[in-house]
Amino acid sequence: MRKIQPSIVLVKSICSPKPREELNEVQLNEAAHLILAGEGVINPPILLKTGMDPHTGLESYSVVDGHFEHYAAVRGREINARKGETINAYVIEAEEDEKLFMEQISMFRDRGRGTTAPVATSS
């Protein structure tokens, strides 16, 4: 179906295959405070809808890209459970579409992380 939806997602319904211990806790804490202050994240994580969690009855998601943003949101929820309850994210609806969006991630996000050199203009 090739669809990706901007969504507001409960932080507790997201899991990441990347361990939190691999990330810098000081930076996560700083990012968490920025997310709480801005009431959102400027670089939303990309999530794959994985189904219904049998324990909570909530839709569940797995991080495809944006593990740092996800764990910063988790830290934000630890700091302030009410303000950090949700995060804006892009949600891939179907697993068969993950490969297509991974190609986009590779092209748009991994390509220098937006740090390309300015283009010279002639006068």
Predicted regions: what is each one?
Residues 81-123:
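Amphipathic, charge-rich alpha-helical segments that serve as recognition/docking helices
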Residues 1-85:
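Short, charged/polar connector segments at secondary-structure boundaries
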